[in-house]
Structure formats: C-alpha cells, structure tokens
Amino acid sequence: MRAYFYDGLPGDQRLPHDSGKPVNVDDLLAIGVYYYHLPELESVDNLARDRGYKNRDEITVSPKTMGDVYESKVKMFFAEHLHEDEEIRYIRGGRGYFDVRSKDDDWVRVLLEKDDLLILPAGIYHRFTTDETNYVHAMRLFKEDPKWTALNRGPEVDNNGHRQEYVKTFLAEPAQ
C-alpha cells in the first residue's frame, strides 16, 4: 500500500497522479479508513469474523472478464460516491487505486496490491479505478447480504444520514 495526495492534473485516471506528498496510515485512520496487509487468507477470515462480515464475493475488473462494458464500468467506479455501508476490499491480484476525501476535501490516492485490505467507513466520499495494467481481482466482504448501492455526490447525498454521521464522527471540529 502506498498513499499520497492526488495531483489533480488532467489525464488518464489509471495513472499514478502522485503529487509527491505522502499520506501515512495514521492519516487514513483519522478519516476512518483502515488498512491491513494480510498475506494469509486465514487472517482475512479472522478479520471478517471479528468485524461481523458474514458474506463475501469476488470480482475481477479487466477488459478480458468484462468485455465491452469494461470502460463504462471503470468510469462508473470513478464517479465520486458514497455507500451507506462499510466498503471492504481485499486485493487477490493486480492493482487498483481507491481515492478518498481528506478532512480538507482533497483527494488521497491509495494504491492497493495483492494481499492489501482496505475498509472504508459508511458515508465517506470515494472512487475507484484500476491502474494502467487494467486488472484487479478483489474479494468484497459484507456484513449483510451483498449490495453495492453507490450514491453519487451532490447536495441531496450530502444530507444523507450516513454522510452526516461520517462528517460528525471524522470531519467535524471538536467543540471548544
């Protein structure tokens, strides 16, 4: 895993867009994002049990597996959105980028590779893309039945209860 501020320059979303400003694991924790490197599947199973993840599936994002819909899917994943549930991804192969919003609403890019696991809290704005190899194989873990409802960023979604709880927990300044 490597995390850094996104450079904001135009160009292919699958390129690194590395600003040269690193972000560490503690910075990610401060916005509710958990990172683990778990080379053994048993460790993933233990984490799933401890956090109450009852269901899982696997997805391979690549032109070979998705065919003609690959480009449109990658564009859809890259639209800024949130979920009303935690998003848990364990990378089984390939590489991908999760971009998450910092406390200052800047993009933080997190490069994930094989054996990396990332947990995004409900309500955090984020987006995803493969890297320039156009291949990632990931396990998705869920607390309940698998669902993937993306709510794209906008004024209505800013007022969503899960978003408001996230803001209160991770972004609001402490009362003086």
UniProtKB/Swiss-Prot annotation:
Reaction equation(s) it catalyzes: 1,2-dihydroxy-5-(methylsulfanyl)pent-1-en-3-one + O2 = 4-methylsulfanyl-2-oxobutanoate + formate + 2 H(+); 1,2-dihydroxy-5-(methylsulfanyl)pent-1-en-3-one + O2 = 3-(methylsulfanyl)propanoate + CO + formate + 2 H(+)
Localisation: Cytoplasm; Nucleus
Alphabetical list of InterPro entries matching this protein: ARD, ARD_euk, RmlC-like_jellyroll, RmlC_Cupin_sf
Pathway in which the depicted protein is active: Amino-acid biosynthesis; L-methionine biosynthesis via salvage pathway; L-methionine from S-methyl-5-thio-alpha-D-ribose 1-phosphate: step 5/6
Residues engaged in binding Ni(2+): H81, H83, E87, H126
Keyword tags: Amino-acid biosynthesis, Cytoplasm, Dioxygenase, Iron, Metal-binding, Methionine biosynthesis, Nickel, Nucleus, Oxidoreductase
Entry's transmembrane regions: none
Gene Ontology cellular component terms for the protein in this record: cytoplasm; nucleus
PANTHER family referenced in this protein's UniProt entry, alphabetically: ACIREDUCTONE DIOXYGENASE (PTHR23418:SF0)
Function, in words: Catalyzes 2 different reactions between oxygen and the acireductone 1,2-dihydroxy-3-keto-5-methylthiopentene (DHK-MTPene) depending upon the metal bound in the active site. Fe-containing acireductone dioxygenase (Fe-ARD) produces formate and 2-keto-4-methylthiobutyrate (KMTB), the alpha-ketoacid precursor of methionine in the methionine recycle pathway. Ni-containing acireductone dioxygenase (Ni-ARD) produces methylthiopropionate, carbon monoxide and formate, and does not lie on the methionine recycle pathway.
Record family assignment: Belongs to the acireductone dioxygenase (ARD) family.
Listed name of the protein: Acireductone dioxygenase
UniProt source species: Fusarium vanettenii (strain ATCC MYA-4622 / CBS 123669 / FGSC 9596 / NRRL 45880 / 77-13-4) (Fusarium solani subsp. pisi)
Gene behind this protein: ADI1
